[in-house]
Structure formats: C-alpha cells, structure tokens
Amino acid sequence: MAGAMRKMAVYLGLVEDDGYDGRGFDPDDDFEPELDPEPERDHRRHEPAHQSHGAHQSQRDEEVRVVQPPAQREPMPRAASLAAESSRPARIAPVASITQERASLEKSAPVIMPKVVSEREPYRITTLHPRTYNEARTIGEHFREGTPVIMNLTEMDDTDAKRLVDFAAGLVFGLHGSIERVTQKVFLLSPANVDVTAEDKARIAEGGFFNQS
C-alpha cells in the first residue's frame, strides 16, 4: 500500500525518487493501485450461504430419491394351496345335545295308539217285502234302530221300486250307512255300526231270506 502511494506521489511530482527514473519506468504508464486482500469477515459472511445451499441441495436430493415399492408376492398355485389347506387341522363342529333333540322330537311326533279290534257284536237281519212305496217308513224305522235290512223289491213294479231305491240311498247317506245290490231287485242296507259278514252276504245272494234273532 505504501509503495503504491509513493508511486502516485512520484507520478504527481510531489516526491522525487531517482529509483523510478531508470529503465523500465515510464511516468505515462498506467498502473492500478494494489488492493488489500479481502478481509476474513467477508468469507465468514458467505459461508452460511454456501452451507445453506448445501443443505438445500441435500434436502432436494432426498426428495428426488425414488422409493422402490415392495416386491409383490406371486400367487400360490392352486395345487399348493389345496395341499396347504389339507395339511391344516380340520375344525371340529360343536356337538349338539342329542338327548335334547330326541326329547323335542318325541314331543312333536304324533302318538299312534294301537288299534283295538273289538269282538263282533251280534246283529239281527230283517227281511222286508214291500209292495207299495208307502212301506218306506217301515224300512227307515228298522234301519234307524241299527238293524240291517234286506229290501226285496221283486213284488213291486219298476216305478215304485226305483222310488224306494232312491229313498234307501238317501237314508243310508244321512245315517252314514251303506247299501249293496245283492240281486236285480234285492238290496242290503247296513247301518254304520254293523258289519255284515261275507258269509251272511253269500247266504242272502243264494236266496236265503230270513229273520235272524
């Protein structure tokens, strides 16, 4: 710095210095003053900026970093999955109370009573030979009393015989009995509480009209 000021003073003629008159010195030469070195505080002032820039750069690098997704597991083949399932212990279903279910079934099941076959009650068959339709009342009275009636219509004309058959059909229907044709004009009327045996029916068909006591 002092050398530069002296050069400037010599150049202006304020100071004489023979050393500058020698060869190689020209007062007309341009020169620049020497600059003092940059103070250290300037470096310290710029250091935080560099450090901040480095921090931002590292943060930017971390943001740009690509995160690879985890590798997906390949699906297990069906045969392998079935083998794995078969190797697992089977779940045991809870055992319900059989006694309780049986008791409930016994309560809900219908009770079937054994059929009791009673002994055949004795019956008496009455044979009637009506000649007119007016005798239908007599047939109805015997049948209502629970007596089987053999109705022989051979002595009646066809018109009255047909009317009497219609009456007998309505009679047995109303009292829940039955009517059977033995021959063309002979009919057996059986009440609901009487079961005429097959043997007696055969005898009636053979012409054995009788009053059985």
Curated annotation (Swiss-Prot):
Gene3D superfamilies: SepF-like protein (3.30.110.150). Its main location: cytoplasm. Residues 16-89 are annotated as: Disordered. InterPro entries: Cell_div_SepF (IPR023052), Cell_div_SepF/SepF-rel (IPR007561), SepF-like_sf (IPR038594). This is Cell division protein SepF 2. One of its GO terms (biological process) is FtsZ-dependent cytokinesis. Signal peptide: none annotated. Homodimer. Interacts with FtsZ. Pfam families: SepF. It is found in: Cytoplasm. Cell division protein that is part of the divisome complex and is recruited early to the Z-ring. Probably stimulates Z-ring formation, perhaps through the cross-linking of FtsZ protofilaments. Its function overlaps with FtsA. Residues 27-39 have a biased composition (Acidic residues).
